[in-house]
Amino acid sequence: LHALGPAGVESMTSAAGVAHLAGFRYGALGLPLAFVALPLYVYMPAYYAEQFGASLAALGIVLLLVRIFDAVTDPLMGYAADHLLSMSGPRRMLLMGVGCGVLLLGFLGLFFPPPSMRQGVALLAWCFAMLIVTYLAYSALSITHQAWAARLQGGDLSQSRWVSWREAATLAGVVLASVLPSVAGMSVTTTVLGLALALAWLALRGAPQPLIMGSVGLTWHRLAQPWRGAAFRGLLGVFLLNGIASAIPATLLLFFVNDRLQAPGLEGMFLAAYFVCAAASLPLWLKVVARIGLGAGWMSGMLLSVASFAGAAVLGAGDVWPFLLICAASGLALGADLAFPAPLLARVIRLDGASAGLEGAYFGWWNSASKLNLALAAGLVLPLLQGLGYSPGQPSAQGLMALSLAYAVVPCILKLLAWGALWRWRRQWDKEQ
């Protein structure tokens, strides 16, 4: 640095500041998008049951239908993202603004239905319609946001930085959304969401703009293009195994805290430790990318996850502090799951010459698989637990053992399988560092 002289040091500092500002401007949209996702998944069912007396069984059917629709339409949203990213800057930002507005209106309509639609079948129909509107807008914006980074020039480290800014904002949104509805209510939450969307849209206007590659026509051949690449299929298999391993503990967390630890009401503290440590770990994982690369870095994160999480299998009633440490260590490992998969997918897109202009199609299928993870986790592990004798709120010794195995051991086994699958994938496809 001394050899550069004061002007050189100042130039480097200025360049770093510009890079951080660009990363912030790009990543900011992650906050309101995560802000929308958490209340929809966590708060909406209880809100409808408590405020409007909706049947939980009927709400469950509505949510199942909407989530199936959401997962199925993600590849089409990927096409829409490719089309949008092929537009000129002003038109692109206009449509992004429209998407933000539709998202806010859907969220507002969902939590504040008109008085004439607050009972019986009318309420369920309104809920279904608003969920469809909200999910479509959410998927279109989130897939476009992901594909945006993939169209920015740069190699593995550059892509990891864009993704880290996006995921850091996402984690901030998760933490904010986990607290605000219960503390300030849905009116304040909706107002904050509107402000966050507006500010994120303004920030995105000043972010580095994606490379325009020309518009693509909607054909099945174009939508199916990602599946023709063996590298994509292999990486998606790793992503599915790893994602199910992460989704199972998320599905069972409340049961584990309430019945195994006997610490009801402390799940917020555990989640906060998990997500805060994940956010704090992102700069560290960026250094790992620079040192050993994306594939080896993700494998390291998987091993850290297994090493930190396996201990949860032996916890019992009152083991609050050991579990808090496990959550913190697992959060550090989560940073790898956030920082590495998307840049690896961006590399696959770069190496597949036939995929120019189809980044959205790739991320559409990728998001669909991510939603499939959650569905598979719930659909497989909950019936299995019931079959093994676990009953929430009335656990037997056999049921608690089954809960511990399902919560901690099964995810670790799946993580190790994902590690093995990634090791095999890297032998053939991990060519670019």
Task: List PLM regions with ranges.
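Membrane-embedded alpha-helical bundles of multi-pass transporters/translocases
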Residues: 8-433
